[in-house]
């Protein structure tokens, strides 16, 4: 149920107008990008979400709502309300673990997602890389960062192997192990893109796990594993730059020291992989 309004409302106004019988249960963090809170009434629970990035355009939040509206409930929470700065979605019962599931199970989830109809908007990384450069702390901008940005701009993004709807933030904290199977939460970066980009972006523990995930996916997608792995590797520099830039951007935005540590670690990975 989308609800259009140019006037922002408070949390209490949201609850009193749309969920008068519900009460907040708890606030929880669902990843590095922000928090949400639960509301409940007679055992029924919803998650109330706000944009993780207060500086992002409103269209980005609306896209997340549209993505959730068209995804099947077996892999994503269904949305119930959207209005400026607020979204209410189903609460997904289950366990959120600190490690990834079996690679074959995860490959099955991603392959099923990639078989769904496209969202209708493309994921393009270069504008994000340039935005993070421009919005980062000037003292943190280095010659090496600018050189890599220019190199990627000249090279252009890899041509997609297969174009599909992507989640683009697959890590242990965004996977719910439910009684009916794996489900994904936090769809704020969703869009259409290369399946290899999704696979490259998964937050794996090591290269061995990454290759096994790609192999399991290739079996389902009927792609030569070596061909898919080559395409995944083409995306590595783009994704490392994306992560490093996002951490730098969030550091300037929040002042949270964890983002500096994560940025420094990602820059080191970039140097190793060059």
Swiss-Prot record:
GO biological process annotation, one example: thiamine metabolic process
InterPro entries registered for this protein in UniProt: Aminoglycoside_PTrfase, Kinase-like_dom_sf, Thiamine_kinase
GO molecular function, one term: thiamine kinase activity
Keywords assigned: ATP-binding, Kinase, Nucleotide-binding, Transferase
Taxonomic superkingdom: Bacteria
Catalytic activity annotation: thiamine + ATP = thiamine phosphate + ADP + H(+)
HAMAP family: Thiamine_kinase (MF_01604)
Function: Catalyzes the ATP-dependent phosphorylation of thiamine to thiamine phosphate. Is involved in thiamine salvage.
UniProt similarity note: Belongs to the thiamine kinase family.
Protein name in UniProt: Thiamine kinase
